[in-house]
């Protein structure tokens, strides 16, 4: 089994680093084009219709045609916008989405024209924190787009997005703490190497569930697409955008989906390690094969995104906030304490740490399910109390005698 050697990072020739950067960029672009088409096809099938079927064979060129259409559209700038910020917001939104993918390991070490290099652009001792920071910067583009548009609906969408990121970035960060305790590192390649024998999804199931819910909220996808709710805010923060500027926001959304899916694969599903039973085959985790396993796992999460969009209705804003602050964050804190205690018992020679961890995982999962059911259940709205005639803000109505006197 070939794990990336940390000494390999930063020693590649310039042309190899450039080639890996371009390859990652092309990989993300192709993933976005494929994801848009597959999502529309799957939604069509789930809604008993065909989906895109006109452009190209079986509609396979529909995403490319949509991209060309957006590129050729006139770039309108509405009157009353803050033009510099209005034009800069899509750029701020899309660049961090690509940058965050630079520390994701796509495979082990391979040989390219005689140079041994990992299938990863670079790695850092705090690579996971770097991803969290990069994805958090992207929300500034959304907030600035809402602020600079000079319209009420985009502004409300930007405010919702900022509140959403603040709420769910905390839960997402806390879900990683248990992984750090087990792996002993924040390096993405080190976390993948720590899952050589057992994936963390089996050991840290509550952290995985919290992360899955948080990643959907982090990317503004259904049922958490409150910043761009069509029925409430028209189009949200990109209501006033068209042509390439709108395309950049859409590109950033799907690249973020790919990034958080790749991060979930890295943190919980063993990264590029082959799943069972392929891991029993000699050479399944060497060469270029890990790239196939990694891509398959990422597309599993992408399908989850599409499935949720076709299945679940949008949550109310109060339900969304209650889920983040009253369920995910407390459960994450409780689970961190459980994992820390079990790790401490294991270091002191206690042999029953696995049973403790499994029991605690069951308890935390039950608490998480109960919290979800409690926060999302339909609440009974109490009718407003009846107001007396003289109570504020209803003014006293004139009596019949007063009206007759006024008419006379």
UniProtKB/Swiss-Prot annotation:
InterPro entries: NADH_UbQ_OxRdtase_su1/FPO (IPR001694), NADH_UbQ_OxRdtase_su1_CS (IPR018086)
Catalytic activity as recorded in UniProt: a quinone + NADH + 5 H(+)(in) = a quinol + NAD(+) + 4 H(+)(out)
Disulfide bond residue pairs: none
Membrane topology qualifier: Multi-pass membrane protein
Protein name per the record: NADH-quinone oxidoreductase subunit H
Example of a GO MF term: NADH dehydrogenase activity
PROSITE patterns: COMPLEX1_ND1_1, COMPLEX1_ND1_2
Compositionally skewed regions (Pro residues) per UniProt: 382-398
Keyword Transmembrane helix in annotation: yes
């Amino acid at each position: 089994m070939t794990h990336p050697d940390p000494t390999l990072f930063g020693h590649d020739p310039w042309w190899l680093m450039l080639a890996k950067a371009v390859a990652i960029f092309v990989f993300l672009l192709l993933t976005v084009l494929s994801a848009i088409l597959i999502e529309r096809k799957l939604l069509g099938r789930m809604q008993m219709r065909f989906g895109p079927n006109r452009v190209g064979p079986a509609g396979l060129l529909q995403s490319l045609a949509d991209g060309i259409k957006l590129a050729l559209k006139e770039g309108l700038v509405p009157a009353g916008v803050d033009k510099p910020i209005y034009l800069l917001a899509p750029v701020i939104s899309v660049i961090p989405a690509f940058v965050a993918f630079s520390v994701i390991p796509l495979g082990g070490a391979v040989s390219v024209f005689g140079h041994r290099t990992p299938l990863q652009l670079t790695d850092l001792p705090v690579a996971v924190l770097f991803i969290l920071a990069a994805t958090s910067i992207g929300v500034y583009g959304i907030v600035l787009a809402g602020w600079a548009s000079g319209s009420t609906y985009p502004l409300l969408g930007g405010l919702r997005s900022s509140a959403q990121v603040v709420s769910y970035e905390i839960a997402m960060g806390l879900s990683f703490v248990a992984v750090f305790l087990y792996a002993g590192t924040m390096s993405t390649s080190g976390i993948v190497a720590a899952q050589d024998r057992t994936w963390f999804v089996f050991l840290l199931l509550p952290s995985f569930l919290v992360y899955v819910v948080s990643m959907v909220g982090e990317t503004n996808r259904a049922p958490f697409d409150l910043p761009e709710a069509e029925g409430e805010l028209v189009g949200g923060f990109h209501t006033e955008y068209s042509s390439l500027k709108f395309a950049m926001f859409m590109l950033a959304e799907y690249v973020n989906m790919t990034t958080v899916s790749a991060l979930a694969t890295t943190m919980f599903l063993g990264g590029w390690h082959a799943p069972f039973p392929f891991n029993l085959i000699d050479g399944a985790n060497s060469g270029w094969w890990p790239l196939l396993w990694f891509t398959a796992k990422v597309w599993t999460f992408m399908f989850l995104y599409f499935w949720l969009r076709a299945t679940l209705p949008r949550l109310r804003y109060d339900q969304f906030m209650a889920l983040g602050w009253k369920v995910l964050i407390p459960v994450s804190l409780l689970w961190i304490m459980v994992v820390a205690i079990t790790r401490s018992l294991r270091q002191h020679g206690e042999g029953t740490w696995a049973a403790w961890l499994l029991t605690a995982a069951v308890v935390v999962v039950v608490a998480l399910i109960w919290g979800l059911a409690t926060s999302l259940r339909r609440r009974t709205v109490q009718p407003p109390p009846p107001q007396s005639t003289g109570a504020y803000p209803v003014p006293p109505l004139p009596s019949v005698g007063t009206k007759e006197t006024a008419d006379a």
